[in-house]
């Protein structure tokens, strides 16, 4: 079923959210996109195609004994996407006044998640450049996992040294051990 929580321990749902189970042993799974009220749809244990920019979360509780009228199972999500964080600092002879824009080349979209393991299959190709979120002199982007030997392209536009015009810098960001793994920054 589809359940929504706005505070710990309180679930609301559509189409009658109460879950009634016979006594037995069950495997429970939960997926969230930490973004909207509708997480990805799964068919035969595999998600619909996933997208960059979304903080996918996954949880499981395997072989849970249900043998009473009411049980509580705590859900502790883990991140299954990955994220890139770039923090700028001025060096010798330069003062950064503002990070104006940041673009990064994330993996192609369309990877899927396995419901039983929470694994998002890593992409093997880069997609189109996308805007990163900016907070002060820090840029951040959540993306699907990727495995590739080539680096990602990062383009930064900054205001520096109180100049009237901005400067644009492009650099190549290598993937640690050739991969941005799920749950890592």
Predicted regions and their residues:
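Short helix-loop boundary/capping segments
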Residues: 60-152
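Edge beta-strands of extracellular beta-sandwich domains
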Residues: 39-47, 164-176
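Well-ordered beta-strand positions in beta-sheet-rich domains
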Residues: 2, 74, 131, 168-172, ...
